[in-house]
A protein has these predicted regions:
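A short, flexible beta-alpha/helix-coil linker loop
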Residues: 36-38, 104-107
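Radical SAM/AdoMet-radical enzyme domain recognition
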Residues: 1-98
Length: 189
């Protein structure tokens, strides 16, 4: 059987749904959040609802979810100024922040390799302020390289889908918003 299910959400409506999701058996949440700047958030999401997302995160934390991760897509000339704010939020609120290299999913035809902020660059930016300790996750199953903060206040994950693809050992199944199952983000069917 299935022992564990995680849900990825934009969290626009999470404030009102967090407790019900937890009560239904969901234990882990991944929330997509690329910016804490209201204007940048609106530009990326085409909606002016950053506060709704932040309220949803608070509601999920207060409901008692076992794990809440923030997924931030790392785009060159956009994300550099967002990284430390997301890190500080994660450290203070108990969220794991995961930075994902900008991948060529490209429904909007905007992907260019020059726009990828690579995982090693993200780690170097963070190391300007914090000491990071790599986590040996050779026994873990998942796409992220993980790091603890040396002071013990939280951890981050770096998903290097472009610079170090993980397709050979991917173990994920995804359900699209319209209910279709996909074994790969890059598949057409």
């Amino acid at each position: 059987g299935i022992d564990d299910i995680a849900m990825t959400t934009n969290a626009f409506f999470l404030k009102d749904q967090a407790q019900g999701l937890l009560d239904a058996g969901l234990k882990r949440l991944n929330v997509s959040l690329d910016s804490l700047d209201p204007e940048k958030f609106r530009d990326v999401n085409r909606r002016d609802c950053l506060q709704s997302v932040l309220d949803g995160l608070d509601a999920a934390r207060n409901a008692g979810f076992k794990s809440i991760k923030i997924n931030a897509v790392a785009v060159r000339n956009f994300s550099e100024s967002e990284i430390m704010g997301l890190i500080e939020m994660g450290r203070s609120d108990g969220f794991e922040i995961r930075f994902i290299e900008f991948m060529p999913l490209d429904a909007d035809k905007v992907w260019e390799r020059d726009k990828v902020l690579f995982g090693h660059e993200i780690v170097e930016l963070i190391k300007e302020k914090y000491e990071l300790v790599p986590i040996d996750n050779s026994l873990e199953i998942g796409p992220a390289s993980e790091y603890n903060f040396a002071d013990g206040k939280g951890k981050i994950g770096i998903i290097t889908a472009v610079s170090n693809p993980f397709c050979d050992h991917c173990n994920r199944i995804r359900m699209t918003a319209d209910g279709k199952l996909r074994t790969c983000l890059f598949s057409e069917n």
